[in-house]
């Protein structure tokens, strides 16, 4: 498979995930920069400059989304899994050894946070994920390093 096709597929999948997030209407109601107490484990917006950092960030979001009860989260989590696979192919094409990121070890307490504020967690996670994906889309045009 030509690497340009993999890169194009990666960008298309990112756009698809962003569209899915947009289709979940309540995600529009929060700023991705908004600080919500107790949700510090959700990655914020900061430049994601390398393929390994992209994979780590997606692993955390995937872990958070699979902990949520919403059916929408299952589809987005599956999309993130596919996106991570594509990032690994891109990394391999650049001779990068990209270890499979595992997310956060500290999410044991996530169950309690979700019980207390599941809706807020979902809104903030999706909003920040959307921002991170748009950042990744931009970074992919700059040919990120390992």
Curated annotation (Swiss-Prot):
Sample GO molecular function, one term: peptide hormone receptor binding
Keyword Secreted part of the UniProt annotation: yes
Localization in the cell: Secreted
Gene3D superfamilies: 1.20.1250.10
Keyword Transferase appears in the UniProt entry: no
Entry keywords, A to Z: Disulfide bond, Obesity, Secreted
One of the record's GO cellular component terms: extracellular space
One Pfam family cited in the UniProt record for this chain: Leptin
Single GO biological process annotation from the record: cellular response to leptin stimulus
Disulfide bonds: 96-146
InterPro entries associated with the record: 4_helix_cytokine-like_core, Leptin
Function field: Key player in the regulation of energy balance and body weight control. Once released into the circulation, has central and peripheral effects by binding LEPR, found in many tissues, which results in the activation of several major signaling pathways. In the hypothalamus, acts as an appetite-regulating factor that induces a decrease in food intake and an increase in energy consumption by inducing anorexinogenic factors and suppressing orexigenic neuropeptides, also regulates bone mass and secretion of hypothalamo-pituitary-adrenal hormones.
Family to which the UniProt record says this protein belongs: Belongs to the leptin family.
Protein name: Leptin
Gene: LEP
């Amino acid at each position: 498979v030509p690497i340009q096709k993999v890169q194009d597929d990666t960008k298309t999948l990112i756009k698809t995930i962003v569209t899915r997030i947009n289709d979940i209407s309540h995600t529009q109601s929060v700023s991705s920069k908004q600080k919500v107490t107790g949700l510090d484990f959700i990655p914020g917006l900061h430049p994601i400059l390398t393929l390994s950092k992209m994979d780590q960030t997606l692993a955390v979001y995937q872990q958070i989304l699979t902990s949520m009860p919403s059916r929408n989260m299952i589809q987005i989590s599956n999309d993130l899994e596919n996106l991570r696979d594509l990032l690994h192919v891109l990394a391999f094409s650049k001779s990068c050894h990209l270890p499979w990121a595992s997310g956060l070890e500290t999410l044991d307490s996530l169950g309690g946070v979700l019980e207390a504020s599941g809706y807020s967690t979902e809104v903030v996670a999706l909003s920040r994920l959307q921002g991170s994906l748009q950042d990744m889309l931009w970074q992919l045009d700059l040919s990120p390093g390992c």
